[in-house]
């Protein structure tokens, strides 16, 4: 392994990697911290896996946690301005005080970035920042509201240097451009309105900025809770259909292409629903290129159809209550 231009030997003994560094004490210190941290984390995982059979392992786990806590903090206090200190702050786990024992996850979510030196641009040369962001946004923010996520983003951006801010913004752009949870489209809109439309960001050209703003403007009209855009199309039987004329407790907008295998499967399901449910009306809209004479490109743009099938669920007032189901 080549680390900071120094020679590193990767040796294996009994299945455990032992790393030796030649020519640099500082680099050696990094690997020592990494090795001790990884070893103790693996030990805790092993102890946790046996808790069902050995409940007393909980005391060993607490002991290892305390050891790592003291070990990491001693490095930070001894070398506060070093990159080793930054490295330790990024690999150490956020710990909730004992008084927050019953609400530790809430504490961690609210203090996750407090101790991170997000003005140290050297961190961009590693995966440490990405790893930290992955854990926070993929785990802790997974079930949070868009409003809460936006609050955390604003705090994170405010705390970061310009270089780290640029990296974080593109990371968030990638994550929320087409989010798994449709409600998080509000997060993308927030990113555009507050950052991508206003700031000078690395690699953000005028053309890219315009396209990003355009997509946010489309999304803000079709987020959950908004009224569906007006829809006119010609169905497979040559009949003109208007969404405004449809009266039902629930309305499914099913955008599909005939050569899409998942569309074929889903269309059978929705055809069955249409026949068996009196309170559900299904509008199946063929958006294939061959059908553009019956379905305008405006529909594809208005409803932000990037993949097929795309599905919207409306209530009796034509309000969007779910998307991408």
Descriptions of predicted regions:
Residues 1-80, 90-91, 97-115:
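A non-transmembrane, solvent-exposed segment enriched in polar/low-complexity residues
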Residues 239-270:
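Short active-site neighborhood of thiol/selenol oxidoreductases, capturing the structured segment around
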Residues 1-10, 140-145, 156-165, 176, ...:
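Start-of-domain marker
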Residues 204-243, 293:
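N-terminal "domain-start" segment that seeds a small globular fold
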Residues 148-203:
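A cross-family structural signal marking well-folded subdomains
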Residues 106-161, 169:
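Structured, charged N-terminal subsegments at the starts of enzyme catalytic cores
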Residues 279-298:
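Thiol-based oxidoreductase modules, predominantly thioredoxin-like and allied folds used
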């Amino acid at each position: 392994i080549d680390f900071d231009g120094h020679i590193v030997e990767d040796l294996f003994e009994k299945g455990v990697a032992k790393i030796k560094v030649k020519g640099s004490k500082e680099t050696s210190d990094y690997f020592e911290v990494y090795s001790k941290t990884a070893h103790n984390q693996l030990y805790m995982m092993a102890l946790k896996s046996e808790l069902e059979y050995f409940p007393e392992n909980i005391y060993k786990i607490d002991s290892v946690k305390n050891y790592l806590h003291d070990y990491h903090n001693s490095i930070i206090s001894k070398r506060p301005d070093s990159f080793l200190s930054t490295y330790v702050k990024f690999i150490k786990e956020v710990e909730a005080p004992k008084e927050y024992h019953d609400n530790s996850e809430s504490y961690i979510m609210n203090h996750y970035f407090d101790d991170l030196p997000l003005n140290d641009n050297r961190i961009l040369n590693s995966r440490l920042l990405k790893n930290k962001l992955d854990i926070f946004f993929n785990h802790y923010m997974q079930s949070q509201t868009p409003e809460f996520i936006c609050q955390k983003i604003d705090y994170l951006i405010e705390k970061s240097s310009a270089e780290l801010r640029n990296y974080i913004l593109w990371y968030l752009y990638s994550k929320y451009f087409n989010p798994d949870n449709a409600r998080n489209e509000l997060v993308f809109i927030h990113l555009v309105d507050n950052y991508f439309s206003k700031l000078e960001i690395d690699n953000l050209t005028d053309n890219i900025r315009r396209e990003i703003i355009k997509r946010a403007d489309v999304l803000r009209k079709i987020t959950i809770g908004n009224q569906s855009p007006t829809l006119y199309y010609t169905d497979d039987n040559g009949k003109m259909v208007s969404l405004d004329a449809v009266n039902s407790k629930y309305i499914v907008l099913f955008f599909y292409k005939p050569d899409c295998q998942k569309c074929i499967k889903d269309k059978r399901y929705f055809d069955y629903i249409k026949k068996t449910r009196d309170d559900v009306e299904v509008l199946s809209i063929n958006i294939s290129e061959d059908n553009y004479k019956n379905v305008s490109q405006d529909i594809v743009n208005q409803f932000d159809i990037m993949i097929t099938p795309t599905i919207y669920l409306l209530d009796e007032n034509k309000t969007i209550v779910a998307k991408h189901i």
